[in-house]
């Protein structure tokens, strides 16, 4: 039976008590007795939520190039996991609608749903059904933003009240909102998904007036959270023993000097920020706003909306250069993790992307940039309090599930950003050893014991692992052979 890390038990117990664990939503195969059996871990075909012929062909094509049976088995299990288990298709006003849950929590996160589909975007030109899924999610996300741009997670029914304990949070909980933790990256991920789909297909279908209204509100919200003219409308407090679940000073967060950076209440991990200027998310905002500007220009011919995006991106970029860096202790500069604009900063990294380590994955940094390289090297070291090294693996975790718990996402990120064959091989070895016999990636696992893991069903990590294998097939096929 899966061992639950004690520091994460409180969260999982609360979610289970609220009736939001959705493991019964699909038929999952029983846990593997061991990797040596390599039994198919996918749901039976009749129980799969969504099937794409292009994705199935991609699985067969790439798996045939993988010599290691266990690595091929993991790819075949993980890559289609989002489609197999998390998608619910429908229609709204005659247009496709897609509700995509995270896995074992029955709600749609803007960040997770975007990242979960991202791995399939290169196949959309080949598959009408897959394009319909992307259109459905892009439209669903626009409607979610119009319900409340400050929410991070949403209910399937826009009129339903949250089934999570978030319903008792001290904030403005609206119908349709599952949780209302303000995170910059939530809105940025929707911009990136729209751009990726447009770039791959040149299909204007999802980019209608509804989408444009949602996109405009997203940009306005990012600007509002620069807080130049006061604290803004967002407040959040939660009655919880963990300080990572709430914001200080009446729910507005720690004080800041208003310098043009965007405030974030919470990190991509859903943990509260110590200092409200979360640098990885501000860097992501710059790249995402420029992606959105391109969609406005090309898909809608809306030069004014594109200019609005570009202007905010330029302002935040200027502020990042002035306030987003710190000394590395060795005479150089690195990106800080969080700052307050007064000169105070913390250095750490969290496995959830956008992380400092994961910036190139989002187009928010260049892998060849010396500033980013110094930052990533420092994050993969003892300077980062959430870098863990054990007998099972090395990797980065975060406060969300506690000490000594490595997130496979951080190992995948390291491999995706590396050009060194030995580093990538080591990451693949760690990942193969992390699944605890299940054939899937997890939220986290103990640095000394992969059988001690959190979240048996976490589709974002599964999709990112699929991304890694596809990347290696294109970039370093000899490592798979």
Short names for language-model regions:
Residues 1-10, 20-25:
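N-terminal secretory signal peptides
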Residues 29-35:
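Signal peptide processing junction and immediate N-terminal pro/mature segment
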Residues 36-111, 136, 165:
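Low-complexity, Ser/Thr/Pro/Gly-enriched N-terminal "stalk/linker" regions
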Residues 54-67, 115-128, 189-204, 283-301, ...:
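Well-ordered alpha-helical scaffold segments within catalytic/enzyme domains
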Residues 74, 129-144, 203-223, 292-295, ...:
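Extended, well-ordered alpha-helical scaffold segments
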Residues 106-134, 138-243, 459-473:
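Aromatic-rich carbohydrate-recognition surfaces in CAZymes
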Residues 110, 146-157, 166, 219-286, ...:
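Extended ligand-binding clefts on enzyme/binding-domain cores
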Residues 169-175, 180-182, 346-366, 404-481:
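C-terminal capping/lid segments that line or modulate ligand- or cofactor-binding pockets
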